[in-house]
Design a protein with these regions (language model features):
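C-terminal beta-signal and terminal closure region of outer-membrane beta-barrel proteins
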Residues: 68, 76, 88, 136-173
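Single conserved hydrophobic/aromatic residue that forms the stacking wall/gate
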Residues: 1-11
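Strand-connecting loop/turn motifs
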Residues: 29-32, 120-122, 162-164
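Extracytoplasmic gating/loop element in the C-terminal half of outer-membrane beta-barrel translocons
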Residues: 41-124, 128-130
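Residues that define the transmembrane beta-barrel architecture of outer-membrane proteins
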Residues: 17-21, 99-104, 161-165
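Outer-membrane beta-barrel pore domains and translocons
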Residues: 28, 39-41, 128-132, 172
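Repeated loop/turn-to-beta-strand initiation elements of outer-membrane beta-barrel proteins
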Residues: 31-35, 115-116
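Membrane-embedded beta-strand positions of outer-membrane beta-barrel proteins
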Residues: 36, 125-127, 169
Length: 173
Protein backbone atom coordinates (compact mmCIF):
# COMPACT_ATOMS: atom_id res chain seq x y z
CA UNK A 1 0.00 0.00 0.00
CA UNK A 2 2.82 2.45 0.85
CA UNK A 3 4.67 1.77 -2.42
CA UNK A 4 1.51 2.40 -4.42
CA UNK A 5 1.01 5.72 -2.59
CA UNK A 6 4.63 6.76 -3.26
CA UNK A 7 4.21 6.05 -6.97
CA UNK A 8 1.21 8.38 -7.01
CA UNK A 9 3.29 11.22 -5.57
CA UNK A 10 4.98 13.10 -8.35
CA UNK A 11 5.82 16.61 -9.43
CA UNK A 12 2.93 17.66 -11.62
CA UNK A 13 3.41 21.35 -12.11
CA UNK A 14 6.28 23.76 -12.57
CA UNK A 15 6.95 27.06 -10.82
CA UNK A 16 8.88 28.23 -13.88
CA UNK A 17 7.05 30.13 -16.58
CA UNK A 18 6.78 28.78 -20.11
CA UNK A 19 7.46 32.30 -21.37
CA UNK A 20 7.74 35.90 -20.21
CA UNK A 21 6.63 39.00 -22.03
CA UNK A 22 7.40 42.67 -21.59
CA UNK A 23 6.38 45.77 -23.46
CA UNK A 24 7.57 49.36 -23.20
CA UNK A 25 6.05 52.35 -24.94
CA UNK A 26 7.58 55.82 -25.11
CA UNK A 27 5.54 58.31 -27.09
CA UNK A 28 6.09 62.06 -27.60
CA UNK A 29 3.41 64.18 -29.28
CA UNK A 30 3.91 67.95 -29.29
CA UNK A 31 4.62 68.88 -25.66
CA UNK A 32 3.11 65.71 -24.20
CA UNK A 33 4.94 62.48 -23.43
CA UNK A 34 3.59 59.07 -22.44
CA UNK A 35 5.51 56.13 -21.05
CA UNK A 36 3.96 52.69 -20.35
CA UNK A 37 5.76 49.62 -18.99
CA UNK A 38 4.14 46.17 -18.83
CA UNK A 39 5.28 42.69 -17.84
CA UNK A 40 3.82 39.20 -17.93
CA UNK A 41 4.58 35.63 -16.97
CA UNK A 42 2.66 32.71 -18.45
CA UNK A 43 2.55 28.98 -17.80
CA UNK A 44 3.87 28.86 -14.23
CA UNK A 45 2.07 27.28 -11.30
CA UNK A 46 1.91 28.61 -7.74
CA UNK A 47 1.59 26.67 -4.50
CA UNK A 48 -0.46 28.70 -2.00
CA UNK A 49 1.67 27.83 1.02
CA UNK A 50 0.08 30.43 3.29
CA UNK A 51 -3.42 29.04 2.81
CA UNK A 52 -2.64 25.69 4.39
CA UNK A 53 -2.21 27.37 7.77
CA UNK A 54 -5.40 29.43 7.58
CA UNK A 55 -7.28 26.44 8.96
CA UNK A 56 -5.68 27.16 12.32
CA UNK A 57 -6.16 30.93 12.33
CA UNK A 58 -8.54 32.92 10.13
CA UNK A 59 -10.83 31.29 7.63
CA UNK A 60 -10.85 32.27 3.95
CA UNK A 61 -14.12 33.25 2.28
CA UNK A 62 -14.10 29.88 0.47
CA UNK A 63 -15.12 28.27 3.79
CA UNK A 64 -18.67 29.36 2.99
CA UNK A 65 -18.77 26.79 0.17
CA UNK A 66 -17.33 23.98 2.32
CA UNK A 67 -18.45 20.37 2.39
CA UNK A 68 -21.48 20.01 4.68
CA UNK A 69 -22.69 16.56 3.70
CA UNK A 70 -23.40 14.33 0.72
CA UNK A 71 -24.07 16.27 -2.47
CA UNK A 72 -22.25 19.43 -1.39
CA UNK A 73 -18.82 20.87 -2.29
CA UNK A 74 -16.07 18.63 -3.63
CA UNK A 75 -13.47 21.41 -3.57
CA UNK A 76 -13.58 22.68 0.03
CA UNK A 77 -13.25 20.20 2.90
CA UNK A 78 -15.49 20.28 5.95
CA UNK A 79 -14.79 22.92 8.58
CA UNK A 80 -13.09 21.47 11.61
CA UNK A 81 -10.69 22.51 14.36
CA UNK A 82 -9.26 19.01 14.36
CA UNK A 83 -8.18 17.95 10.88
CA UNK A 84 -8.53 14.19 11.10
CA UNK A 85 -8.26 13.85 7.31
CA UNK A 86 -5.06 15.90 7.22
CA UNK A 87 -6.58 18.20 4.58
CA UNK A 88 -3.84 20.79 5.04
CA UNK A 89 -0.97 18.58 3.89
CA UNK A 90 0.72 19.79 0.70
CA UNK A 91 -1.35 18.72 -2.27
CA UNK A 92 -2.53 19.88 -5.66
CA UNK A 93 -5.50 21.45 -3.85
CA UNK A 94 -3.24 24.44 -3.19
CA UNK A 95 -1.70 24.65 -6.68
CA UNK A 96 -3.10 26.90 -9.37
CA UNK A 97 -2.11 28.70 -12.53
CA UNK A 98 0.06 31.71 -11.73
CA UNK A 99 0.00 33.37 -15.15
CA UNK A 100 -0.37 37.15 -15.07
CA UNK A 101 0.06 40.36 -17.01
CA UNK A 102 0.77 43.65 -15.21
CA UNK A 103 0.70 47.29 -16.12
CA UNK A 104 3.67 48.30 -13.99
CA UNK A 105 4.12 51.96 -14.75
CA UNK A 106 2.26 54.66 -16.67
CA UNK A 107 3.54 58.21 -16.82
CA UNK A 108 1.93 61.11 -18.65
CA UNK A 109 3.85 64.37 -18.78
CA UNK A 110 3.62 67.85 -20.20
CA UNK A 111 6.70 69.92 -21.09
CA UNK A 112 6.23 73.67 -20.70
CA UNK A 113 7.89 75.95 -23.25
CA UNK A 114 10.61 77.88 -21.41
CA UNK A 115 12.41 79.47 -24.38
CA UNK A 116 11.70 83.03 -23.23
CA UNK A 117 12.37 82.37 -19.54
CA UNK A 118 15.54 83.88 -18.14
CA UNK A 119 16.20 81.40 -15.31
CA UNK A 120 14.52 78.13 -16.26
CA UNK A 121 15.74 75.77 -18.96
CA UNK A 122 12.86 73.26 -18.74
CA UNK A 123 9.75 72.52 -16.69
CA UNK A 124 7.87 69.24 -16.91
CA UNK A 125 4.72 68.31 -14.98
CA UNK A 126 3.75 64.63 -14.85
CA UNK A 127 1.24 62.18 -13.43
CA UNK A 128 2.51 58.68 -12.69
CA UNK A 129 0.82 55.44 -11.66
CA UNK A 130 2.69 52.32 -10.50
CA UNK A 131 1.26 48.79 -10.25
CA UNK A 132 -2.00 49.98 -11.75
CA UNK A 133 -3.48 46.70 -13.00
CA UNK A 134 -2.85 42.97 -12.73
CA UNK A 135 -4.71 40.62 -15.06
CA UNK A 136 -4.76 37.11 -13.60
CA UNK A 137 -7.02 34.28 -12.47
CA UNK A 138 -4.78 33.60 -9.46
CA UNK A 139 -6.79 33.71 -6.22
CA UNK A 140 -3.88 34.74 -3.97
CA UNK A 141 -2.71 38.25 -3.11
CA UNK A 142 -0.27 38.67 -5.99
CA UNK A 143 1.00 36.14 -8.55
CA UNK A 144 4.36 37.96 -8.64
CA UNK A 145 5.83 36.75 -5.38
CA UNK A 146 9.00 37.66 -3.60
CA UNK A 147 11.28 34.96 -2.27
CA UNK A 148 14.54 33.24 -2.86
CA UNK A 149 15.53 30.35 -5.06
CA UNK A 150 14.26 27.84 -2.48
CA UNK A 151 10.80 29.46 -2.49
CA UNK A 152 10.31 29.59 -6.26
CA UNK A 153 6.61 29.11 -6.96
CA UNK A 154 5.58 29.14 -3.29
CA UNK A 155 3.28 31.94 -2.17
CA UNK A 156 3.99 32.65 1.51
CA UNK A 157 1.33 35.35 1.66
CA UNK A 158 3.65 38.35 1.41
CA UNK A 159 1.94 41.68 0.96
CA UNK A 160 1.96 42.74 -2.71
CA UNK A 161 3.52 45.92 -4.07
CA UNK A 162 1.14 48.83 -3.46
CA UNK A 163 -0.66 50.73 -6.18
CA UNK A 164 0.54 54.32 -6.13
CA UNK A 165 -0.40 57.45 -8.02
CA UNK A 166 1.80 60.54 -7.80
CA UNK A 167 2.22 63.95 -9.35
CA UNK A 168 5.67 65.34 -10.03
CA UNK A 169 7.43 68.41 -11.28
CA UNK A 170 10.87 68.45 -12.96
CA UNK A 171 12.60 71.82 -13.10
CA UNK A 172 15.95 72.45 -14.83
CA UNK A 173 17.85 75.68 -14.21
Amino acid sequence: HLLRRQRQMCIRDSPFADFYIGWNLNLNVYDFDLSVTTYGSFGNDIFRGYERNLNYTNKPASILSRWTGPGTSNTEPRASFVDGNNNIRPSTRYVEDGSYFKIRNVQLGYNFNMKNSGYLDAVRLYLQGKNLMTFTDYSGFDPEMSGGVLDTGIDRGNYPSPRTVSVGLNVKF
